[in-house]
Amino acid sequence: MAVSRKDWSALSSLARQRTLEDEEEQERERRRRHRNLSSTTDDEAPRLSQNGDRQASASERLPSVEEAEVPKPLPPASKDEDEDIQSILRTRQERRQRRQVVEAAQAPIQERLEAEEGRNSLSPVQATQKPLVSKKELEIPPRRRLSREQRGPWALEEESLVGREPEERKKGVPEKSPVLEKSSMPKKTAPEKSLVSDKTSISEKVLASEKTSLSEKIAVSEKRNSSEKKSVLEKTSVSEKSLAPGMALGSGRRLVSEKASIFEKALASEKSPTADAKPAPKRATASEQPLAQEPPASGGSPATTKEQRGRALPGKNLPSLAKQGASDPPTVASRLPPVTLQVKIPSKEEEADMSSPTQRTYSSSLKRSSPRTISFRMKPKKENSETTLTRSASMKLPDNTVKLGEKLERYHTAIRRSESVKSRGLPCTELFVAPVGVASKRHLFEKELAGQSRAEPASSRKENLRLSGVVTSRLNLWISRTQESGDQDPQEAQKASSATERTQWGQKSDSSLDAEV
């Protein structure tokens, strides 16, 4: 049972630490809100009274925490559980340290912006004193989380820090504010590492109740500040319109009022777009001019300016604020130049229609037509097809077809000649088809005719040399075939036909040479 109680105590301490972290984040947001509100206000007396109340409440609150924590130290948990919880707490502590480093880096920048914005309304001492007091009052409860016995070596450092803080608050020196914040951040992280031993439920409940009371007091003070600022804004709205645009606060409030009127008129103009199409962008350009006249000091932090606008608006009704919040994205679109250009484009087109001399000659139907048809009729030089077609590939097709036709004709003639040679050789084979008995006995009585047939073609060739090449070739073919058909064997006939073909090609070459000479 003891182990289970220790586990439950460890889990409960983790849950409490999570709630404390959430409360710390909420307190940081409240500090930022206080800074933004302090930059816009003109009153100093309520702040001083609120600071006095908070200091008194902090001084009353601190001893009660120590009294609740000191007399009830619990026995420590087992070593394994302590190590597990410490590993979890270390990771969370590293995250806190990172957040605090970021805040420490951003704090002097925000204070500079506040000092620049509040020069007209506040003295720099009070402007820097306000965030200092609020920060350190809100950071006191986590430092007092542990008893002196459990804290050990950090107790002396914390007591010295607490002793220094009220003295520095009384001094209110603005130059030491970033240094104090940076020095208090790392020293705050050291005692939080020993949160494992903080398992007293009574002390945590006291802390939670104190923090709730502190948050309630802060909320009350914020409501007072907002109500006082609303009254100041309503009183000074008339006087600020007459001021020069060099003041950043006056120009920001003027922009809020102008944009509210512009968007209310823009909603009405959307219902009747034909009547109010041109005046709306002119109002948008009028709102652009005070934007350009704003000094760069006001544009240093866009988040703060947006929050100031959001807090300056609650002087009006809540539904109107919701409408303006819904119409915030169109503000960016209305500032852009394309809105004015869309109004000017139709006027330029009408002037061009009136000034162009070519469209005066056309009828009303041609004026209504698209610009492509007008440009096509106005440029007749492009209709000359001779120059364009000579360069195109379509005009070169007839030349290519003629050349191809000649080549095809030559090819067909060569094919015909080869076919004619083959067809002339066919009847010889048909004539020599004979029965086997006749072919075997033919050599007995045809030996004498074979010698005569061999001698006769030579004499006929010599006689035909005098004629033209084509005629001699054909004559030699016919003579040789008629002589060989009745006398020679099929093998001898084939030899004779090959010899005649050779002589034919030789005679053709000789005749071509004679014709050239």
Curated annotation (Swiss-Prot):
Ranges of compositional bias, category Polar residues: 48-58, 120-131, 355-373, 494-517
Renumbered residue ranges of the record's region 8 X SEK repeats: 203-271
Cell compartment(s), UniProt: Secreted, Extracellular space, Extracellular matrix, Basement membrane
Highest taxon, organism lineage: Eukaryota
Basic and acidic residues biased stretches: 134-151, 161-174, 219-233
GO CC terms, sorted: actin cytoskeleton; basement membrane; extracellular exosome
Keyword Repeat tagged: yes
Region ranges (Disordered): 1-401, 481-517
Omega-N-methylarginine sites (modified residues): 424
Molecular function via GO: cadherin binding; structural molecule activity
Residues the record lists as Phosphoserine modifications: 38, 64, 78, 121, 123, 347, 356, 394, 485
Function per UniProt: Anchoring filament protein which is a component of the basement membrane zone.
Protein name per Swiss-Prot or TrEMBL: Ladinin-1
